[in-house]
Structure formats: C-alpha cells, structure tokens
Amino acid sequence: MNISIMLKPASSNCNLRCKYCFYNDLSSHREMPSHGMMSEQTLRSTLKKAFDFAGHDRVMLSFQGGEPLLAGKEFFLKLHDIIRELNVNRAPVSIGVQTNGTLIDEEWCRIFKRGGYLVGLSLDGDETADSLRIDANGNPTFSRALNGAKLMQKYGVDFNILVVLTKQVANRIEPIYRFFKKQYFKHLQFIPMLKPLCVDESGKPISKTTYNEPFPS
C-alpha cells in the first residue's frame, strides 16, 4: 500500500497572481490567509509519522502551494537529510512538486535531479495563452516559466506541463499543442478551470461541453 501525503510548505503564499486562481481567492477569505512557511519541526514530525506507518511501503510526497519553492532551497535540502535519517526501512520514496516555474534556476534543477523529483510546471501555452498568469506586480511570467522548463530539460529533470483549460486556451488548443510539441514537452495535463469565489471577465470558467471540445473521442 502506498502512503501519499500532500504538503504545502509555503501555505498559500505565491509570487504570482493568476487571474483565475481559486486558491488565492479562497485563502484571502479565510480568517488566517496564510500559515507561513513550514518549520523543520513540522516537516520532521510529518515524515516520522509517514515512515512509521508505511513500514516498507512506498511513501509519496507531493509539495504544492501557493508556490512551494518559496519555502527555499534549504528547506528541500533539509527534506533530503530528514528522509535519509528517518527512512530506516529504506522504503521507496517519491517526491513531486507543483510549481509555476518562475523561480527555477540551475541550483533548483540540481536539487530536483538529486532527489529524483517529478516536477509539475504550470504553463497554459504560448505567450498569448499564458497571459492570465501574472506576477504580484502585474507583469507577465511566460518567459520565466519557459526558462524554468528549458533548464529542467538541460539537467534531465522529469517534469510535465499542467495546463489550466480556460476558454482562451480551449479556443486556441491546436496552436498551443503545436507550441508544446515544438518545445519537446512530452507530458501534458489539462485541467478545467475552477470558479473562484469572485470571477472577473478576464478568466471565465468553462463548461463541461467546452472542456470536451478540444478532445474529441
């Protein structure tokens, strides 16, 4: 039996302000929007419970956000140390991280490669399709995310592309697919946009019919 654990090391903190982000909208309505960065004590306690329960079974760790890389490189290097210390049964461990890709540099790639990570990179297509993904200052993030993908290719990091299927993306699915193919992105995931608590006209959620249109059976 596999043990699967989702961790949010940066809580809801994110360096992007994607116009369709339901989680940013959701967290802003909570009594405590962010719980801050995960402490080493919390990480250690969580992993100890996981390995004690798993025995020899696989432990799957999934880091999401917000933007999990905001927790910093030292956090993930410490993660590797704690795994080596607590995994006394030498259970197989899988590590995944879902990121917007804008913070990825060569050192991050070495961390990913060393830990055997599977990285999910959020990218909605070419520069036009990715226009809803802006940073906290309202600036586009496409080139930074694409650079992160190219660096991971350079270092041989396993990654896939996660696409939020908005109407804007659905209407341009063929050129977007050609763009991904040109970049040699081999693994693509398309997920429907979820309706935030408040939605403006720039990013409308799509219907089930619209979601299915780009993928005829």
Question: Which residue stretches match the model-derived regions?
Answer:
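Radical SAM/AdoMet-radical enzyme domain recognition
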Residues: L47-K48, D52-S62, A71-C198, G203
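A C-terminal junction/extension of Radical SAM enzymes
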Residues: V199-S217
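Active-site neighborhood of divalent metal-dependent phosphoester/pyrophosphate hydrolases
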Residues: G66-E67
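Canonical Radical SAM [4Fe-4S] cluster-binding loop centered on the CxxxCxxC motif
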Residues: N2-Q41
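Conserved structured core elements
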Residues: S12, M37-Q41, E106, N139, ...
